[in-house]
């Protein structure tokens, strides 16, 4: 007599019962195995996994998980965007770029920030997996405050404050240290710039370039590049370079035609995005050259285009802002993003290939500034 094969127990389970069985099985694993499993999962699934249990939520925000991801080579680059929305009750807004559910498109998702963060005229930098918000106005007074957001967990803490209270300072990063210049009422040149060691969380003043130069640099922009700190005056557009603790005039060609805040470094080459172009700096010939292959990158071509760019895991991520008007009335503000792969074909020729681009943010607000973009490896 022929017998009917028994169906497996798993097949007889409802979907809910099967999921509970799988979850129970994973929960029985020791910590190191759970960490090893989670470290292999793309971060886009972490919000869903955090709903499994308190234990999972604890793992997903732990430093051990990210150390394991690093050891396994499972790290990913994530983009963060800082906007200033003038008419908003919280003008300093931080976003992360996330993939839409069940889609390949991406969108800027807001990150909650505490009320204690300086919202008016701070500067913002990224070091490792931490975003630092430095100085700014609190109750109409210049602030010493430094707030730090961990990009892995989106949690905030307060760090050691600056030596001098600063409003609208210029900050840049070099070798894991944060150099902060300008933004202080006191014109004492010895206090004009200070540096923050992110490992020891301590501040100290940097040697002064002299009172005359400091007066020129009360409003400035800066960048860390090739072992030096470069500072550009927003009044005279003079460029100065801090090299091995000494100040000297920088190469004017490095900042000519653009601003340091729109530049980034990839493989020790400076790139900048401004108006309708993406360019790279030939440090030997002291010339800016167009990145070939990107003639039609920007959709908007009839007006100045505010842009920012960042090193995105060896690729170039470019953000640009478009304001849409109808009959001279503002309709909406859009932010676009493109990711560009870079290839050096000749010594004096670098090509870019647009990997993807998309509209990532839309708002009805007109007074929107694209202030910073960052890429964190997590």
Swiss-Prot record:
InterPro entries, per the entry: F-box-like_dom_sf, F-box/kelch-repeat_ARATH, F-box_dom, Kelch-typ_b-propeller, Kelch_1
Residues in coiled coil: none
UniProt key word Transcription regulation: no
Positions of Kelch repeats: 130-176, 178-227, 262-308
UniProtKB keywords: Kelch repeat, Repeat
Residues in F-box domain copies: 23-69
The protein's name: Putative F-box/kelch-repeat protein At3g43710
Upper lineage: Eukaryota, Viridiplantae, Streptophyta, Embryophyta, Tracheophyta
């Amino acid at each position: 007599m022929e017998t009917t094969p028994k169906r497996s127990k798993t097949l007889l389970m409802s979907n809910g019962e099967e999921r509970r069985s799988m979850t129970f099985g994973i929960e029985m694993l020791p910590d190191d195995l759970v960490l090893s499993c989670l470290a292999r999962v793309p971060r886009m699934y972490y919000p869903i996994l955090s709903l499994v249990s308190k234990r999972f939520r604890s793992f997903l925000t732990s430093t051990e998980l990210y150390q394991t991801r690093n050891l396994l080579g499972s790290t990913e680059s994530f983009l963060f965007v800082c906007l200033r929305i003038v008419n908003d009750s919280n003008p300093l807004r931080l976003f992360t770029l996330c993939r839409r559910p069940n889609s390949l498109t991406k969108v800027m998702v807001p990150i909650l920030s505490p009320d204690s963060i300086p919202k008016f005229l701070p500067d913002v930098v990224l070091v490792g997996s931490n975003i630092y918000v430095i100085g700014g106005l609190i109750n109409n007074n210049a602030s010493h405050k430094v707030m730090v957001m961990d990009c892995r967990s989106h949690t905030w803490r307060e760090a050691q404050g600056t030596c001098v209270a600063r409003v609208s300072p210029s900050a840049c990063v070099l070798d894991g240290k944060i150099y902060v210049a300008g933004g202080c009422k006191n014109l004492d040149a010895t206090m004009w710039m200070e540096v923050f060691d992110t490992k020891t969380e301590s501040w100290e003043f940097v040697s002064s370039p002299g009172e005359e130069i400091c007066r020129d640099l009360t409003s400035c922009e800066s960048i860390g590049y090739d072992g030096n700190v470069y500072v550009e005056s927003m009044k005279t557009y003079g460029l100065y370079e801090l090299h091995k603790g000494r100040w000297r005039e920088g190469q004017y060609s490095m900042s000519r035609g653009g601003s340091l805040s729109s530049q980034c470094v990839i493989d020790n080459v400076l790139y900048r995005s401004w108006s309708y172009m993406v360019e790279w700096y030939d440090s030997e010939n002291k010339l800016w050259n167009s990145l070939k292959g990107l003639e039609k990158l920007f959709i908007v071509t009839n007006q100045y285009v505010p842009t920012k760019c960042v090193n995105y895991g060896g690729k170039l991520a470019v953000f640009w802002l478009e304001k849409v008007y109808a009959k001279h009335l503002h309709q909406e503000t859009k932010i676009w993003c493109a990711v560009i792969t870079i290839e050096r074909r000749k010594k004096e020729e670098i090509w870019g290939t647009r990997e993807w681009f998309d509209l990532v943010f839309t708002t009805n607000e007109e007074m929107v500034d694209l202030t910073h973009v960052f890429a964190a490896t997590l």
